[in-house]
């Protein structure tokens, strides 16, 4: 079992994107930083906001890229390469169109599923896709032509409450994730639904 050394929250920078569906991953990392009582600070070297905490004697780094979504890999690769963090020790939290609001799922490896942030991370890590993902359901607008406006839009209150609940569920399994016990974390998380 590989312990997680880097947790990345995907989103777009700037106040106009803060509360959008596409920033679900960044919201997760902000909440995790708060729970760990650490502050995210800008670090130009890694093109993002970073923080560090210790879990069972291991350093865990948090990262929210301040690049736009489609350049997230630049930030992830800069930090992972500097600290020699292998893809299997990385967890990327991101919005997931294929899951309804209120559902969060863990997954290891796989393709990008059309997600530009994941696409760039895979490319910047040398086409290695063996990192873990925390998929935070945001639902789908029903028509592929509506996806861009949908992900860049703000969720109605009921949807946002479900997303917040799924983030709470995910935070609850983080001790198992950080220890590398993904099987236990998946069993617990995949039974939850807001």
From Swiss-Prot:
Catalysed reactions listed for this entry: an N-acyl-L-alpha-aminoacyl-tRNA + H2O = an N-acyl-L-amino acid + a tRNA + H(+)
Matches recorded under InterPro entries: Pept_tRNA_hydro, Pept_tRNA_hydro_CS, Pept_tRNA_hydro_sf
Keyword tags: Cytoplasm, Hydrolase, RNA-binding, tRNA-binding
A GO BP entry: protein quality control for misfolded or incompletely synthesized proteins
Sites annotated Discriminates between blocked and unblocked aminoacyl-tRNA: 12
Keyword field contains Flavoprotein: no
Location in the cell: Cytoplasm
Coiled coil: none
Record site: Stabilizes the basic form of H active site to accept a proton: 95
A Pfam match: Pept_tRNA_hydro
Listed Gene3D superfamilies: Peptidyl-tRNA hydrolase (3.40.50.1470)
GO cellular component: cytoplasm
List of catalytic residues: 22
Binding positions for tRNA per the UniProt entry: 17, 68, 70, 116
Primary subcellular site in the record, as a coarse category: cytoplasm
EC number assigned by the record: 3.1.1.29
GO MF: peptidyl-tRNA hydrolase activity; tRNA binding
Matching PANTHER family: PEPTIDYL-TRNA HYDROLASE
Family according to the record: Belongs to the PTH family.
Role, per record: Hydrolyzes ribosome-free peptidyl-tRNAs (with 1 or more amino acids incorporated), which drop off the ribosome during protein synthesis, or as a result of ribosome stalling. Catalyzes the release of premature peptidyl moieties from peptidyl-tRNA molecules trapped in stalled 50S ribosomal subunits, and thus maintains levels of free tRNAs and 50S ribosomes.
NCBIfam families per UniProt: pth
Quaternary structure annotation from Swiss-Prot or TrEMBL: Monomer.
HAMAP family: Pept_tRNA_hydro_bact (MF_00083)
Protein known as: Peptidyl-tRNA hydrolase
UniProt source species: Pseudomonas entomophila (strain L48)
Organismal lineage: Bacteria, Pseudomonadati, Pseudomonadota, Gammaproteobacteria, Pseudomonadales
Gene, per the UniProt record: pth
